[in-house]
Structure formats: C-alpha cells, structure tokens
Amino acid sequence: SDKAKEMGASTKFTAGESADALSYMALAGWNTQSMLEGISPVLNLAAAANMDLAQASDIVTDYLTAFGLKASDTTHFVDIMAYAMAHSNTDVIQLGEAYKACASTATSLGYSVEETTAVLATMANAGVKGGEAGTALNAIFTRLATNTKKCGDELANYGVNIYDAQGNMQSLSSILTGIAGVWGDLTDQEQANLAKTIAGTNQYSKLQTIMAGCSEAAAEGGQSFSDYTEALNNCAGSADKMAGTMLDNMNGRLVLMQSAADGLKIAIGEDLPPA
C-alpha cells in the first residue's frame, strides 16, 4: 500500500515490514482510516523497543481489544508500554505476555490499563515479569473479586480499606499502595497470612516478593503504585521520544538511509515499464 511505502521510506522499517504490521491491524478488524492513523505509533513502539514491527503490531492490536480500548487509543497505549519499558525492568514482549494472562480479567473488573501496567511494572522491578507476573496478578484480581469480604476484613485489621467513603471498591493501585504502606510493619507470619488471603496459596509468595520490593523502593523514595498509575495517565509522547533516541546515532541514521533506499527502489521499480 502507499502507506506501507511511505513508512518504508521515512522510518527504520521497510515497506514490507510495514505491510506486515498493517495486516495484523486488518486481522483485528481495523478499518482503513484506523490503520493509517495507527501505524505510526506502532512504528514508534517497535523502534523504541528495537523489536520486530509485525510483533509490535500483533501485541498492540491484541491487547487494545483485551483492555476494551479502541484503535483510536493506539497512541496512548503504546506510550504506556514505552513508559513502562523505560522506567522499570521489563520490555514490550514481557508486557504482552503478562497482559495475555490478566488483561481480560482486569477489564471485566473495571481496572484500567494504566493501573494494571503500573502493577506489572512494579512486579517486574521485583523480578516477577512476563506470564509469571500476569498469572499472579490475575490471581489477585480474582481473589479480590470473589473473596471480597475476607480480603476486606483482613486488610482492615491493618488499617487498609478496600472501599471508599461511598462504599465503592477502591482502585487496584490504591489498595496495593495501602498494603505496601503497612507491609514493613508486619511480622513474617502476618505478611504470609495476608498474602495468602489476597493472592491465594499458589501465588502468595509472588505478592510477598512484590511488597518487599515496594517497601524497599518506598524507603528509597521510589514511586508507589498510585504514583506510577498517575505517571502512565500522563505519559504522552513517550514512544516517540524513545524511538527518536534509539535512532539518533550513526547506526540509526544508517538504518534510516537503507530503509529510504529500499523505498526508492520500490518506487523506481513501479515506474519502470514491463519488460
């Protein structure tokens, strides 16, 4: 397509790679206008992450849908992933693996992509990432939803409320920030009991690891879950900035020149009369 050729001539990716990325958007049911608007931010994400363009497109289209977002949300979604990649020990592929395990449940419970990603990024900094992180977080989601009274009563014992003044459940980031705030004051046994109540017997050790990491980060002035969520709500331009940084060196400029040359070859080839 003309858009694929345009992207091939002006970015590090070839026209063929751009066409592959567009094909994933088509498979996701995007219309032509959405594809034309969505390809540039996906290109930025792939360049920022130094990853395969088609794979980036596949991840974006899959998990936009899982989080109940639309094609028009593509730019914000890729900025969220780019910000998380830049500010935590994870990458786009690992985020995709984590989303696969927990995004649908998060959406069904009303948790946003921002707070879900904030928790996953914090988990990654504690060494829990990818599908392992997504599975653990999915267990926490499920326990909070199906074992609400027991979780609420247990947390209330330590001064953490899962409901606001109007009786509505607090956001995930608020609940986890509250737990992290009291975690360091609990005995080992109290920590284990609380973790089992919230995450279940199969995943409680992951929650212990996460909270230990959060307590350490808080002691060093790091971001809380709520702070990270707020940052992700205001991360516009992250993917574009990271892509520019990745390509702003001699190797990046050579890649762009090669891509432009490939685009020129296509254009010349199309203008030549048939033999």
Model-derived regions: residue spans:
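A short, structural motif
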Residues: 1-76, 83-95, 106-114, 126-134, ...
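EAAAR-patterned alpha-helical heptad-repeat segments
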Residues: 114-121
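Glycine-centered helix-coil hinge/cap
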Residues: 190-204, 221, 272
